[in-house]
Design a protein with these regions (language model features):
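Short, low-complexity N-terminal intrinsically disordered segments enriched in polar/charged residues
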Residues: 1-26, 33
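A solvent-exposed, acidic/Ser-Thr-rich amphipathic alpha-helical stretch
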Residues: 21-75, 83
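Generic short beta-strand segments
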Residues: 32, 88-94
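Short, cysteine-centered beta-strand-loop-beta hairpins and adjacent loop/turn segments enriched
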Residues: 93-101
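Short beta-strand edge/turn micro-motifs at domain boundaries
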Residues: 101-129
């Protein structure tokens, strides 16, 4: 990706498309996902991710059976360096009827390595309070 914001948008789009290869292409490894309940999972490579971890849409559909896609409601840059940008993300999970099942907040970090940007860390904060 050419910049940090494009990396975030591409990552989000790949999740909505449920496209494994496109999703993995948006990631910089090692990649860590941390959930609101304290679980942290790290994949060292794309193959490691495929072998050991579920794709995000599989996790979402386990708890939200009628999930159709997620809307990106807010993308706010929080901090930046030359090689890393931290974003606050607010998203809504939309069901097959077009209604919002749940709204979440998250922190996504994009990093630049080898001249391209990708997502290296995603923390789902859960429901906003």
């Amino acid at each position: 990706m050419k910049d940090a914001k494009s990396a975030i948008l591409g990552h989000h789009e790949a999740i909505n498309k449920q496209d494994t290869e496109e999703y993995l292409a948006t990631i910089k490894f090692p990649f860590t996902y941390q959930n609101f309940n304290g679980v942290a999972l790290t994949a060292e490579t794309a193959q490691d991710y495929k072998d050991r971890l579920e794709m995000p849409w599989e996790i979402i559909k386990r708890t939200e059976k009628e999930w159709a896609y997620s809307s990106l409601d807010l993308l706010e840059e929080v901090a930046r360096s030359e090689s890393s940008v931290v974003f606050k993300v607010a998203a809504s999970r939309i069901n097959n009827s077009g209604d919002t099942d749940i709204a979440i907040h998250a922190i996504w970090i994009a990093v630049k390595t080898d001249g391209t940007w990708g997502i290296q860390f995603r923390h789902n904060l859960g429901k906003p309070v």
